[in-house]
Every structure is written in C-alpha cells, then in structure tokens.
From Swiss-Prot:
The lineage of its organism: Eukaryota, Viridiplantae, Chlorophyta, core chlorophytes, Chlorophyceae. Induction: By nitrate. It comes from Volvox carteri. This is Nitrate reductase [NADH]. InterPro entries: Cbr1-like_FAD-bd_dom, Cyt_B5-like_heme/steroid-bd, Cyt_B5-like_heme/steroid_sf, Cyt_B5_heme-BS, FAD-bd_FR_type, Flavoprot_Pyr_Nucl_cyt_Rdtase, FNR_nucleotide-bd, Ig_E-set. It catalyses: nitrite + NAD(+) + H2O = nitrate + NADH + H(+).
Amino acid sequence: MTIPELPLGGIVSQAVELGAPYEPPLTPDHPEWKVHVPAAAVDKKDQDTPDNWVRRDPRILRLTGRHPLNCEPPMDVLMEYGFITPPAVHFVRNHGAAPRIPWAEHRIEINGLVDKPLFLTMDELVALPSITFPCTLVCAGNRRKEENMLKKSIGFNWGPCATSTTYWTGVRLRDLLLLAGIKSPEQGANFVCFRGPKGELPRGSDGSYGTSLTYAKAMDPSSDVIIAYKQNHRWLTPDHGFPVRMIIPGFIGGRMVKWLSEITVTEVESQNFYHFMDNRVLPSHVDEALAKEEGWWYKPEFIINDLNINSAVARPWHDEVVRLDANKPYTMRGYAYAGGGRKIIRCEVSLDDGKTWRLGDIQRFEKPNEYGKYWCWVHWSLDVMTFDFLNAKEVLLRAWDETMNTQPAIITWNVMGMMNNCYYRIKIHPQVDSDGVMGLRFQHPAPVELGERGNMGWREEDNLVAQALAAVKEGATAAAAPAAPPPVVAAAANGGPRQYTMEEVAAHNTEESCWFVHGGKVYDATPYLDEHPGGAESILIVAGADATDEFNSIHSSKAKAMLAQYYIGDLVASKPAAAGATVPEPQPVASTSSPAVDPLVVLNPRQKVKLPLIERIELNRNTRIFRFGLPSPQHRIGLPVGKHVFTYATINGENVMRAYTPISGDEELGRLDMLIKVYFANEHPAFPDGGKMSQHFESLRIGDTVEFKGPLGHFVYDGRGSYTLNGKLHKHATHMSFVAGGTGITPCYAVIKAALRDPEDKTQISLVFANNTEEDILLREELDELANNHPDRFHLWHTVSQTNSSDWKFSTGRVTLEMFKQHLFACSGPECLALMCGPPAMLEHCCVPFLESMGYSKEQMIHF
C-alpha cells in the first residue's frame, strides 16, 4: 500500500483510512511514535494473500508461513520498548484473514437474555463512558515450542515472546450489559457469549470465532472486562481487532474475541466450535485421537481462562557469548507475569541446579486497580559477575505470585501444547573464540530462530538425539543388515560441526550432489536418492533449499529420525573470513541431468508456481473438478505420464502439502484439471475433521490461487509399453495390471488414458477399481468410454462395498485373490507389470500378497 502524501508527512492510521474519526498522522518526532512505531507499508510476504492491504512491521517473526498471520517479536525488540509494547510488534494470533471492516458499517449486537437488546454503531459505542488501563496479553501457547520438542502437539511453535503489554481503552462490559437490561442467573443468564464476524473462518457452523464468560466474571466490577476500541490511546489496528474487540485482563488471549460483532447472554456456555476445540489443557495421556474418541474437548474442567505464572530470560539471549577475559559485572534481565490479577512478588535465578536461588530486582510499572488487582507483567534484573557463570551448567529462572505459587521445575506435555510454564532453563557451554579467549555460550530451550552463531535451542537438539536413538532402537530390532557406522561430520576450526551458508547449500542441487536444510541443519541426501520410496525426484525437488516445511508436512517421526545419518553440519547466516582471506563464491556442481527449460512449460521442480482457479465443475455431492488456468492458452503443464504434483496451503496456521495427480495432461493446453473428492468434517466418525486439503479446495473461489510444485514421482510411462524407473532404469511391459482404490484412480487413469490414446500402443491393460459405493466411483464415464472403445486392449472391473442397485453387474465386497485372478493378468514373465494406488492398508494387506501369489515380484509392482 502506498502511504498518501501529507503536507506535514507522517503515517495515517489504517483505522482512519477505514473511516474512524480523525487522529493525527504519526511521525518519528511525534510524542506517541515510540509506543506505536507504525508500519509504513505492506510487507512483501503479504502480497498475494487476503491480507495484502494490512501494513505490518518486517521485524515480526512469522510462525505459520505467510498467511494467516501468527507472529511474535524477537526478544530484543520486545524488551527494547520496555513496559509498553508498540502495536506494530505486539504478538498476533489470527485464525484467518484480518477482516476489512469500515467503521461506519460495523455494528455490535447485544441480545439473548436481556430486556432491551442493543444494536450499537461504533460512534454510539465510543460516546459511552470509557476507561483506560495497561494490560498484558499472553497467548496460551506461549513457550509451546519447548513442548513440541518433547512430542508434537497440535499447535504451532510459539517461542517465549507471545506476550505484550499496551494501554487499552474501552467501555466496561458490565455497563453495556446493564444498559441492555441483563437478566439474572435465577432467570437463566449464566453465560455471556462473544463472537466475531460470521463466515470469517473455515470451521464451525457459521464460520465465526466465539467463546464465553460466566455471568459472574462478566459482571464483576473488579475484573475490568472492556469492549476496547483503542490501543495505546489510538484506534486499534486491523491485526488487533479494528474496530472493536474484547479485553479480559488476566485471561488468556484466546478469550478476547477480535472484530467483535455479537454479545449474547445465554443459559449455557458458548457452543462455538473454537470455544471447545481450542484453549484446553488436557491430561498428558490424552492425545488427539483419544480426545476425539472420548469427548475430552467438552469436559469443562479442562478449559483455560486465567493465565498461570510464567517468566523468561531476555539477557543473556540465545547464542550470546560472555567473554571471560576478566571478572566483570553483568546484568541479567527478563520478564514475568501471572494471571487473575495476582501480583508477581519474586523472580529468582539459580546457577547451581536449584540448590540456591538469587533474588532479582523487580521493576513494577503499574499500580493495582481499586480492588488490588495487577494486570501487567513485570521486568526483572539481577546483577552478577561473569565468573559466577563459570561453574554453572545451567541458568534456572522461576517466578512467584502473591498466593505463594511458583513455576514447576519439569515441563508437562499436553496435546495442545498450552500453558507451558516450567522453569526457564538455559544451558551454558564453554568455548574459545578466535582470539583464544575463554567464553561461555548461552543456549535457550527453544527460540523461534537460530541464534546469531547458527545454533538451535537445546530442546531441539535433544529432540534430534531422541529421534536418532529411536531409529537406532528400531533398526536393532529389525535384525537386518549390519548397522552403518555413525556419520562422520567434518569439524570446523573451532571444534564444532562444519558450518555452511545457504549459498553453499544452494550449490548442491543435483543428483550428483544433493544437499538440503531441515531445522537449521544441513544434510547430504545423495546416498539416499536411489533408496527413497518416492523416488529421487521427491528429494531433488528440494535440493539446495530449506526443506523444513515440506519435509514436516509429509514425513513421520521415523523419517525425521533417519535424517541423523545424513547430517553434515549446521546452517549459518554467514561465516567470517580469516584475516586477509576472501570468501570464495560457491561453485555449483556440474550436472548431467538438468533438462533444458521450456518457456511454455509451467511446472518447475525447483520452485512453486501459483495458478488461479478459473472454473469449478460439480460432479456430485462431494466431488469436483477444479480447473486452474495456465499463463496462456499455449502453455502446458509439463507433467510426464505417471508423475504427480504437490499442492501447498496454509490451513488454520499449519503448512499443509499433499500429492495429487491431475486428470489433464500436456495435450490439454492452457489448463490444469484436478479431480478432488472433498472429505467434509463431521461425516466420518473415524475422521471428524475431514480432509484438510480437500476442504481447502472446496473453500476456493474463482480467482483464488493454489501453489503447485513438480513434477515428481519415480515412474514415467514413455509410451508403447516402455517405462522408466527413477529416471535411469528403462523397461518394457506388454501387460499392465492396475488396482485402484477410491481417489487412487487418478494416476492409474493418467497412464491408461495415455496408452489407449496411441493406436500404435499394443499394451494390454486391466483395471480392478474398488470403491465404497457406486456414487463414489470417480471418472466412471471416462473409464467406461475407454473400455467400450478399446475392448481388445482394456478390461475394466469394479467392486463396491455396498450397493442398492439391482442392475449392478460387477463385484460386491473387498478385493479378493479370486477377483485378481479373474480380472488381472497373471505374471508370465518380466514384461508384466502391476501398478496400484489406494489406501495403504488395502495395498499392503491385500494387493501385494495377492499379486505375489500371481507371480509378480516386488520389482514388478509400482506404487504410485
């Protein structure tokens, strides 16, 4: 967004641009500049997202990709501003796009168990009596990354900076409810529910975010619950709820609904999807599956409201090194907070594993409200001498509140990764710098970013070690080939692991030398290319790049543990040159396999390409063809027959990647067609959430874009019976037997269609296609047409689990060996090939053993 030219310069607030009453533009010399530091432009990361109009500070650390925005500030930025955090660097938790709401159009409806329902405009709201006070907001997931390093929760990785403090201005909720004539609990008014705009989010019956308070909390004058419209004395920004939001001091941020649209007084708590499926701390033994199976989400005792006690160290920060050339004063710093209005009374540091504790100095910025409640964090400091760290292995921090509660020593995992408040524990590592001076490096548990020296947090390192040990243990029980020796990692000059910059990694992007980055570590996957189950291209697609998101989206913990044997060093931002030396430019490794670039081919195995949706074709209740436009009518996909593509999306804050085979090929110019069966939420008891990516496709509107990457896959049908495996092994088949289950038909269909299209292709083809019902059969008309047009070359057989049709002439029930023998080719030699795609259990327990009994070797079976 371009900031309009102003006579006196300055940045106009986005609230004013959306019609809020005038407030003067901000300039660096304005007295309010420091408590706002407004972003001047739209960040390039937000271009091509629904938030492409929201101005954001580029310093924020984005935790869930580009969209939606979930971010926290770096610790040094958070602490730099002191007690009051500028909104531009205040942490943000968004479940979706920030809605663009004009001031004049917004209304707040107050209804339910009230005598006088209200329908307030913003002008009417701000005309009511208001209060202003400072309040610390905290996401319940603050410090979640530490939990995720023990065991993955269902939440993304918050670091220790999901907390911020600002002044809030608004109308007391109690006053509004009294104005509306709220009924009493005796009359059924037990809860006050809040929700944001309808249709804002993909989950829930109305697509809104909502939650509730008890009547007692909402009406308690000591709780200072307000309907806020200003932050640090200026109108709210879009990310913080403009034009209006809830502020509930002492509560977790997840209860403070942004873009507030409706307040409803009810007899029962909010029935909103997010009220139940978010912000809970379940017992440690309850995982996601058990929570769904046994209804743990709906048990009221596990809801989170009040914040717990928590604290963190800001100095020394992660990867900081304190030189020990002299015994010098050093000031440690950090923050602490508590919930429920409780006062922080102690911040303590231990340098001897908790045997003794040193009391820090507390800087308290607020006075309590008239009821004695404290709503803000404190900052603490502790003066030590640098030699005090010399015999310490760890720094421990804990805080106490006025009820004499403190933080637990040990972390407790829960499925949502929420409310982690164990001791803040920093490891201390001795090291010698390039000048030969002894120093100590501090390693925090799980910071969002790598440190300035390229190191990850110690809990992350522990996690990698645990995965490697699990892999070794699993390998030992397999009693297979002798174990390979542990990897030898070349040492850097300082004795640590070899360090590489991203430029050096990028030079290794070929089959001859294939490196990639995962979680700040560098891996050489070259030896594994031929062994990868998905073929070499599945790795080469990320060669020379950071593969963290793509790897995590589709790999299990077992696969992650296998990384250890290919580890070669750590990723660093840059490497200092030796005195008088120059850093040579990395030289790319020569490749003999790089294809020439065709300007009319869309897919690029090295980069994601973004394509717009141009048409939706509804086939039945849950099946669609999504047609995406290519850059011109002359462009083609560039997808060899048998290969597939990856699609990418950020869904509810999670980076999701799925493999699909388009049903259009290179012969259909100007478009890419995806056949998608939508797995809706709450339809199958075993999968109550439905399919993430298929529901994302369902939410697309014409003009929306999807990112694609490819081609990839280990099998290519070259035509006339010839095929290639892993880009190297060229073979020929005279008979091809296909087995497909459900949506697994798409790669099979691509090969069958290509073979039958060529009149010179004499390959004999059979297909057994398994589905649940007749209505579930995808591409039925297309397959029937191919079978009718090529009866001498293509035999088609269906089986369904159930049917009500008296005209059904095919099988009923699961696939059987007898069915395979009747409708597929027995293996009579090396030119017979079996190709399959479907549910893993069907392939593993039925297809593979049946085909083996028909003479097929594992080498003659292709798994798409």
